[in-house]
């Protein structure tokens, strides 16, 4: 009753294909292509990929060459129109989309060292901002993809600021087939998952909803 999603990121087409083969052989159920991580020290990786349609298309195709598993393309919010790379990924064979990753940012400066947070062994990099504050940004990008004619019927895995069952309902209502939670788990522990499931179950019982599928896209009608 559980699945394993392997998140991968390569630097070349060959690396993407090889990584896809490795995680497939390891037994994962779904592959998520990380085209969107802002914390990179190498050009042409992470969120740099997600803003480059040609790279999104090439790397998605490379992953598909290495696996028969479903492939999700994880989109960067550090772009004006997320539908552009999303369409490119789907045309290259992506089976679904995941959004959003963190917001490219500088989260603070250490006034003693004058280096940006987080500092690791004396080195810093542009960071990614996550948590409750990014939810409205996530909902906007997800809505854009959900109503895009070229992405009609493409499953979306939603994330970005989800902390409660109410947040989960909102993501589902805008078309997400499922949701992902990371920052809230880091803040509050794994009990947050139990809380979300419990709240969703109660909400469904109160509204006579038999399946979560009934909620998917309900806010788009």
Q: What would you call each of these model-derived segments?
A:
Residues 1-5, 9-14, 196:
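N-terminal capping/small domains of soluble enzymes
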Residues 9-157, 163-179:
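Alpha/beta enzyme core
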Residues 14, 54, 84, 191-194, ...:
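Generic alpha-helical secondary structure signal
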Residues 134-138, 161, 185-193:
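Short amphipathic alpha-helix initiation/capping segments at coil-to-helix junctions
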Residues 135, 198-221:
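Extended, intrinsically disordered, low-complexity segments
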Residues 153, 184, 220:
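Contiguous, function-dense segments enriched for cysteine-driven chemistry
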Residues 169, 174-209:
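Shared catalytic-loop signature of beta/alpha-barrel
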């Amino acid at each position: 009753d559980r699945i394993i999603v392997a998140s991968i990121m390569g630097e070349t087409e060959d690396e993407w294909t090889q990584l896809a083969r490795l995680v497939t052989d390891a037994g994962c159920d779904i592959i998520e292509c990380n085209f969107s991580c802002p914390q990179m020290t190498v050009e042409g990786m992470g969120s740099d990929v997600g803003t480059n349609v040609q790279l999104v298309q090439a790397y998605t195709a490379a992953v598909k060459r290495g696996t028969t598993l479903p492939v999700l393309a994880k989109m960067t919010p550090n772009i004006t129109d997320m539908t552009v790379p999303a369409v490119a990924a789907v045309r290259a064979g992506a089976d679904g989309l995941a959004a959003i990753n963190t917001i490219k940012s500088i989260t603070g400066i250490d006034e003693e060292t004058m280096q940006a947070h987080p500092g690791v062994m004396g080195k810093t990099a542009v960071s990614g901002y996550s948590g409750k504050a990014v939810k409205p940004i996530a909902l906007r990008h997800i809505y854009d993809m959900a109503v895009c004619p070229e992405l009609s019927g493409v499953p979306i895995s939603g994330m970005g600021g989800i902390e409660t069952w109410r947040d989960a309902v909102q993501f589902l209502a805008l078309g997400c087939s499922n949701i992902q939670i990371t920052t809230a788990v880091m803040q509050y522990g794994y009990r947050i998952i139990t809380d979300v499931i419990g709240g969703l179950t109660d909400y469904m019982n109160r509204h006579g909803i038999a399946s979560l599928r009934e909620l998917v896209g309900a806010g788009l009608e």
